[in-house]
Amino acid sequence: MASDEQETQADHEHGGYDRYKELKLLDETKQGVKGLADAGLSKLPRIFIQDNLNTCSSHANNANIPVIDLGSLHHEQGNSSSSRNEIIEKVKDACEKWGFFQVVNHDIPQRVLDEMLDGVRRFHEQDFEVKKQFYSRDVSKRVFYNTNFHLYTTSEINWRDTLYCRLAPGPLDPHQLPSICRDITVEYSDHVKKLGLTLLELLSEALGLERSYLNKDIGCAEGVLILGHYYPPCPEPELTLGTNSHTDIGFVTILLQDQVGGLSILP
């Protein structure tokens, strides 16, 4: 039986273009997409070109994502049933209609958010000789980075590198994290875990369940994964995407986006 990599290789060895070979060359450099950008390319490599590029319409870009204020949950009045029930109803409505919402007054300091974004940026932009020790396709590792997790098995690859940090289940030795962003990753994860538990409680109640159901009864908070995506400047951005249309595999994704933007939501 042929492996996924062998099948991909056979599918693309035609017309003088060996797609598998080009993917392999990219992978073996351990420099990711950042390495291509640093080389000063004027043309997008063929392996990144997406023939059926699907982007959102301008109408979709003008839609208003639901915004939910969690501020009252962190104060004494948050214990009142009317205040909490109002938030629960907003969460329920947002999930039914969008599957996505923005939270404000979530109690995570802006300093932590800014430093986490900067930490991810520092990791990807540090000296290659230091960074390459983390490059891997071994998904059993708790911490690694690469370009496109499914590089050899997908028909469309993205202009993106990713730092992967699996903090739970099981304790992670902080020394496994890159030193250049270690402290802020630990601090950020502590804050995000607390926010995640709050959201699971609200989602449980929005479903008409006990507040602790999603967390304690069925263990939706057992796994914690941080993905630090990095999108280098692209020579021909109209021909590819940083992230294709997809559905996340986790129960809840907490997204931290920088000032560049570009996120599209399909309701």
Name each region found by the language model.
Residues 1-267:
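Peripheral, non-catalytic segments flanking oxidoreductase cores
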